[in-house]
């Protein structure tokens, strides 16, 4: 009933923090499953049936990777583990007091088989063969991440132009200015 009457639906998603067997994130708790819990994906699918804009706020120590979330959520706010001031920061973003301008500090895999996933990591066992013999991707998915390092949206629009670097080549310990 509440979803039917709402203009927008905000869903809180993520893992259960802790140190015991009931936790799905926390110190020393690892998982090979990188999607949302199945019950949360079912909840998203049920809420999507009402055809209202859905915003997901994701609380976890790892980024969200979910086909269901990708397909049905209008926006995802990656809150990580926000601590004491997190609630105020999230409310300020939702009400437009501040603009969500953060960028992802990691690339987010589509599925666990892509991990590790970063910009210059060789892909699979045939990566050295390239596209010349048909091994350009995994069998089930491409090599592209769900969300790339640095991905993020904002309420505003930004344009970068006339970008220049101070040196065309740098050594590993040198700095450049952009």
Task: Give residue ranges: language-model regions.
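Hydrophobic helix-and-loop "lid/oligomerization" segment in the mid-to-C-terminal part
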Residues: 1-71
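Secreted, periplasmic, or luminal enzymes acting at the cell surface/secretory milieu
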Residues: 59-178
């Amino acid at each position: 009933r509440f979803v039917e009457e709402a203009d927008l639906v905000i869903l809180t998603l993520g893992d259960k923090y802790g140190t015991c067997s009931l936790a799905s994130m926390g110190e020393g708790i690892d998982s090979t499953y990188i999607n949302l819990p199945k019950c949360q994906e079912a909840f998203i699918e049920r809420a999507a049936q009402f055809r209202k804009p859905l915003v997901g706020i994701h609380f976890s120590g790892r980024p969200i990777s979910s086909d269901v979330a990708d397909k049905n959520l209008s926006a995802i706010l990656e809150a990580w583990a926000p601590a004491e001031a997190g609630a105020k920061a999230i409310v300020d973003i939702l009400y437009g007091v501040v603009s969500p301008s953060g960028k992802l500090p990691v690339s987010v895999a589509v599925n666990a088989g892509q991990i590790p996933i970063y910009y210059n990591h060789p892909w699979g066992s045939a990566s050295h063969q390239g596209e010349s013999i048909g091994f350009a991707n995994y069998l089930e998915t491409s090599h592209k991440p769900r969300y790339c390092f640095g991905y993020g949206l904002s309420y505003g629009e930004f344009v970068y132009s006339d970008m220049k670097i101070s040196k065309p080549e740098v050594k590993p310990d040198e700095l450049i200015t952009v």
